[in-house]
Amino acid sequence: MEKIVNLKEIRKGGSLSFEYKGQKAILIRTKKGDLLGYIAVCPHEGGDIEWDEQINMILCECHLSLFNVQDGSVYRHSSLFELNQGLTKIDLEVDKNNDIYLAQKSR
């Protein structure tokens, strides 16, 4: 298994970029401590996404689309286009040493 990071290396409210199957990905640790992983590409036009800790949302700066952090669903998008598809979630596992890995079914 390929370790992504140890839990102590990512603060609550922080995020970390990593590569997943040749694509940009993001690991988010919410202020509550939840660990969430997503392909870091907006489903609209492939723009980069970023975690915005202040608003507790994932943001695509290209058209200011917002995605729910808990499930990657579309929260808000521009009225200029239709966006029905949310972000692709990546399942994660944490071992007894607090190392974070891709879950078996994500590999």
Sequence positions of predicted segments:
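Intrinsic disorder/low-structure terminal segments
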Residues: 15-19, 66, 80
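N-terminal pre-ligand scaffold of iron-sulfur
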Residues: 1-54, 73, 86-107
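Active-site glycine-rich loops that stabilize anionic/oxyanionic intermediates
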Residues: 45-47, 63-66
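Short cysteine/histidine-rich metal-coordination sites, predominantly Zn2+-binding motifs
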Residues: 56-64, 74-83
